[in-house]
């Protein structure tokens, strides 16, 4: 294992909602691939403690989804703060990618980055300013070649590591079926 500036950092957050001014991070996971999307390492998947008062602000969809997955129970039992989760994630990433080299990779990753900027600024700063957002290809495929969308189905567990693995697989699918190389 050595840090390589061509490796890609994939990240997913689960949050109590979509508004970083009101909602908080409740789970973070990262993995690293090489430039060809081969998974090199999975980082820690961390349930981030939030207060009962914060969890009570979740809307019906988030309560149903995160209770059903067991995440709410893991968050309540966790003793890991956002800051500690941030530092553990950076420690993992330093082994694989130098700071400032990898774009932030994932699905609808701009939303995750908004939360990182507010609650995990050191981690947000670890990424290059660019984005590798798989949802961009999905939106283009929906408009330009909608028939290929049926070829990739997500499980949609809304568990951070599962979601990242699906994002990597989805990009590999688009590389094979949508992008002409």
Curated annotation (Swiss-Prot):
In UniProt terms, what function does this protein have? 3'-to-5' exoribonuclease specific for small oligoribonucleotides.
What SMART domains would the database entry show?
EXOIII
What keywords tag this UniProt record? Cytoplasm, Exonuclease, Hydrolase, Nuclease
Q: Which family does it belong to?
A: Belongs to the oligoribonuclease family.
The gene name reads: orn
Q: Which residues form the signal peptide?
A: none
Name listed for the protein in its UniProt record: Oligoribonuclease
Q: Which HAMAP family match?
A: Oligoribonuclease (MF_00045)
**Family annotation (PANTHER family):** OLIGORIBONUCLEASE, MITOCHONDRIAL
Instruction: State the CDD domains in the record.
Output: Orn
For this protein, the record's SUPFAM superfamilies field holds: Ribonuclease H-like
Major enzyme class = hydrolase
GO cellular component, alphabetical, reads: cytoplasm
Enzyme Commission no: 3.1.15.-
* Species this protein is from: Klebsiella pneumoniae subsp. pneumoniae (strain ATCC 700721 / MGH 78578)
Q: Name one Pfam family in it.
A: RNase_T
One GO-annotated biological process of the protein: DNA metabolic process
**InterPro entries assigned:** Exonuclease_RNaseT/DNA_pol3, Oligoribonuclease, RNaseH-like_sf, RNaseH_sf
Q: Where is the active site?
A: 129
Taking every annotated instance into account, which residue ranges of this chain make up the domain Exonuclease?
Answer: 8-171
């Amino acid at each position: 294992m050595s840090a390589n500036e061509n490796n890609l950092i994939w990240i997913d957050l689960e949050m109590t909602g979509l508004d970083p001014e009101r909602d908080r991070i409740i789970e973070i996971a990262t993995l690293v691939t090489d430039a060809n999307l081969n998974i090199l390492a999975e980082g820690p998947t961390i349930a981030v403690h939030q207060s009962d008062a914060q969890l009570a602000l979740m809307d019906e969809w988030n309560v149903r989804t995160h209770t059903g997955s067991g995440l709410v129970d893991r968050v309540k039992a966790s003793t890991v703060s956002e800051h500690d989760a941030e530092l553990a994630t950076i420690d993992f990433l330093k082994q694989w990618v130098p700071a400032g080299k990898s774009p932030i990779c994932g699905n609808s990753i701009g939303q995750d980055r908004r939360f990182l900027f507010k609650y995990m600024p050191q981690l947000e700063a670890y990424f290059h300013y660019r984005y590798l957002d798989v949802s961009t290809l999905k939106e283009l495929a929906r408009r330009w070649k909608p028939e290929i969308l049926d070829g990739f189905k997500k499980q949609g567990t809304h568990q951070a590591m599962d979601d990242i693995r699906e994002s990597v697989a989805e990009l590999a699918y688009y590389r094979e079926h949508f992008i002409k190389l």
